[in-house]
């Protein structure tokens, strides 16, 4: 999973 743009 991609947690780069997790806000």
Swiss-Prot record:
Signal peptide: none
UniProt KW Secreted keyword: yes
Subcellular location: Secreted
Annotated Gene Ontology cellular component terms: extracellular region
Assigned keywords, A-Z: Amidation, Neuropeptide, Secreted
Modification sites for Phenylalanine amide: 7
Keyword Transmembrane helix belongs to the record: no
Principal place of residence: secreted
GO BP of this protein: neuropeptide signaling pathway
Family per record: Belongs to the FARP (FMRFamide related peptide) family.
Protein name from the UniProt record: FMRFamide-13
Protein species of origin: Sarcophaga bullata (Grey flesh fly)
């Amino acid at each position: 999973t991609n947690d780069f743009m997790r806000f």
